[in-house]
Design a protein with these regions (language model features):
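Flexible, glycine/threonine- and acidic-rich loop/arm segments that mediate assembly and lattice contacts
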Residues: 1-313, 342, 367-377, 429, ...
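Disordered, low-complexity "stalk" and linker segments at domain junctions of extracellular
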Residues: 304-443
Length: 504
């Protein structure tokens, strides 16, 4: 017996009661709307549906195992907010060791350096309302527990990102990231001290050091890795076990080996069922094998556009133009030699909360720069705002980029607000000079040995959850981390800068 065999009461056999078959089938449809869309609406049964909601939450954000640099850096629990350590700087001076018979050898003293590093305080907070905790959620999820997990991952991700580029001279509340500590450490190792040096002297000492290798915008290659390994082992007496960088660096590196993978026509299993592509997991150098480590947040250098707004309501106001942009001819320290062309510049003001909307330095058009020139321009902090700027971020386009609303500008350096009065990198007062020390759109890589004798993340306390007092029908909490990275032997880490892509 089916629907169409039923008879109505008048015996005519017309079960449809004046409705055609299409209408009766329509009445039987479940419909394509969700239950909530039928609210307060006369319907043919679609509103009776039970929602089909997947019990598994789909995660669109990053995973904890992608935070390679932070997760694999050795951790050390400390007992105070200031941690001190000693360095053996020299065994002694190189004195004459050959003596006459019976003569007392020359005396020389070992040299030590005592150093300290300060813990910084990081955290994010979250809140879940009382009804939110009572509601039944997909997969029987505990909303409070999930929010704690989310904020823990968020804080860890931001720490992983800032491990590289944080700078306490620009934002006092930040720790000094690895790049900043590396620059200061190299100046101390090669020049004896970093104290009292101008920004130009620090940058000269750093970028002219063997511990910094310039890729000049090229793709990472075996020659660069080999040179870095040689410096660590034979110049600064270290060991190597890894190279770490952003995944795009190794993505471009592995492409160089695609042509080395041959397909031999006619050879069984050479084409049909063959595994194509290439994967490089480690690199053998003259001084040992090093593992490739990817961290997607390592030296991220996110670009912005000229129309970008402030990143926070507490960000500083936009800076204002000072000295007009110009080029300095015959700059003997410029790195524009292989990168002459036209460039656009933006500047943002920054504090611990975020960055302002950018000031367009080249609103009148891109600035042409010759191979022997550098670029100089001035700006000052904007007037007003409850939260002043503590530093400025300078952005630049890639070479010969067409300037429009969609053009990408990449961060190339930050300048402390307190340093503007004397000029940055040899510039006049309230001006900055761009010598192309960092090429826009490039990344860095570090070659080193990951050991507690080389680097550590000092933890005044482990990452922890602190519950706040309940003063309303909601539960508030904070995820906290008190710590700082430290490079004990910065010279035993080599940084490869300006790693680019084909055609950069």
């Amino acid at each position: 017996m089916d629907l169409y065999n039923y008879s109505n009461q008048n015996g005519t056999g017309d079960v449809l009661g004046g409705m055609d078959s299409a209408e009766i089938l329509k009445a039987m449809e479940a419909g394509l709307k969700t239950g909530m869309q039928y609210n307060n609406e006369i319907n043919n049964g679609g509103g009776l549906k039970v929602e089909s909601l997947d019990s598994v939450l789909k995660i669109l954000g990053n995973r904890m195992n992608q935070l390679v640099y932070y997760m694999e850096m050795p951790k050390h629990k400390i007992d105070n907010t200031v941690h001190q350590y000693n360095q053996l700087y020299k065994y002694g001076e190189e004195v004459g060791i050959f003596n006459a018979e019976g003569e007392t050898p020359q005396e020389t003293d070992s040299q030590y350096r005592r150093k300290s590093i300060v813990t910084k305080f990081m955290g994010v907070s979250g809140q879940v309302t009382h009804p939110g905790m009572l509601a039944k959620l997909a997969g029987n999820m505990d909303m409070y527990q999930k929010e704690v997990e989310n904020k823990t991952i968020l804080l860890s991700t931001i720490i992983d990102t800032r491990l590289v580029d944080a700078d306490s001279s620009c934002v006092e509340e930040q720790f000094d990231g690895v790049f900043r500590q590396h620059m200061l450490g190299i100046n101390e190792m090669d020049g004896g001290t970093a104290e009292g040096k101008t920004s130009e002297q620090l940058l000269d000492g750093y970028f002219n050091s063997p511990a910094v290798i310039d890729a000049q915008g090229s793709v990472l290659n075996d020659n660069l890795i080999q040179d870095a390994a040689n410096v660590v082992v034979n110049v600064y007496n270290g060991y190597i076990d890894r190279i770490i960088s952003n995944p795009i660096v190794f993505n471009n590196y592995v492409k160089m080996f695609h042509e080395s993978k041959r397909v031999i026509v006619g050879l069984a299993a050479s084409v049909t069922g063959a595994t194509m592509g290439q994967s490089v997991n480690d690199v053998t150098t003259q001084f040992g094998k090093i593992n490739i480590k990817n961290d997607r947040f390592f030296d991220e250098r996110k670009p912005i556009t000229a129309g970008k707004g402030a990143s926070s309501a507490k960000a500083p106001v936009t800076p204002v133009v000072g000295t007009a942009i110009k080029v300095n001819a015959a700059d003997t320290k410029t790195n524009f030699g292989n990168h002459a062309g036209s460039y656009g510049y933006l500047v943002t003001a920054k504090n611990r909360y975020g960055e302002s909307a950018p000031l367009n330095i080249t609103s009148a058009g891109a600035k042409a720069v010759a191979a022997s020139e550098s670029v100089e321009f001035g700006f000052t902090a904007g007037v007003g705002g409850a939260f002043p700027a503590t530093c400025f971020v300078v952005y630049r386009t890639k070479k010969n980029a067409v300037l429009n609303a969609n053009t990408e500008y990449f961060p190339i350096f930050e300048v402390p607000a307190s340093q503007m009065a004397t000029g940055y990198d040899g510039a006049a007062a309230n001006c900055v000079r761009d010598r192309n020390r960092i090429i826009a759109g490039t990344r860095s890589a570090l070659v080193y040995y990951n050991d507690s004798q080389i680097n550590e993340y000092l933890q005044f306390t482990d990452t922890m959850k602190m519950d706040f007092a309940v003063t309303s029908p909601s539960k508030r909490f904070a995820i906290l981390n008190y710590g700082t990275p430290v490079l004990y032997q910065p010279a035993k880490i080599v940084r490869i800068v300006n790693i680019g892509e084909e055609g950069l």
